Amino acid sequence: MNQYETVFILTPVLSDVQMKEAVEKFKGILQAEGAEIINEENWGLKKLAYPIQKKSTGFYQLIEFNAEPTVIDKLELNFRRDERVIRFLTFRMDKYAAEYAAKRRSVKSNKKED
């Protein structure tokens, strides 16, 4: 199993309920394929660097997970088919990226406790 991180941008015309529904759909796909979700972050509505599909903002989502390489093809196929997703990027984390992500999560959880 490899550790992956995926960031996807949802169209800004979605309501909060629709956005959460889309995120749950992709998390469900991962879990159905046997992936273990490590972390999930909603980065909120952000301005895009350049317009995509005539939209200048989007809802950013990050999901970190452990999965077999075959799961990525199924996940990305669903990203491509879903018109709510305007961009996505999935990459395999090496040991340094995984350590950094764990450190970042622990710092973030410490800030929440304060």
Curated annotation (Swiss-Prot):
Keywords: Ribonucleoprotein, Ribosomal protein, RNA-binding, rRNA-binding. Belongs to the bacterial ribosomal protein bS6 family. GO terms for biological process: translation. SUPFAM superfamilies: Ribosomal protein S6 (SSF54995). GO terms for molecular function: small ribosomal subunit rRNA binding; structural constituent of ribosome. This is Small ribosomal subunit protein bS6. One of its GO terms (cellular component) is cytoplasm. HAMAP family: Ribosomal_bS6. Binds together with bS18 to 16S ribosomal RNA. It comes from Bacteroides fragilis (strain ATCC 25285 / DSM 2151 / CCUG 4856 / JCM 11019 / LMG 10263 / NCTC 9343 / Onslow / VPI 2553 / EN-2). It holds the Pfam family Ribosomal_S6. The keyword Ribonucleoprotein applies. PANTHER family: MITOCHONDRIAL 28S RIBOSOMAL PROTEIN S6 (PTHR21011), SMALL RIBOSOMAL SUBUNIT PROTEIN BS6M (PTHR21011:SF1).
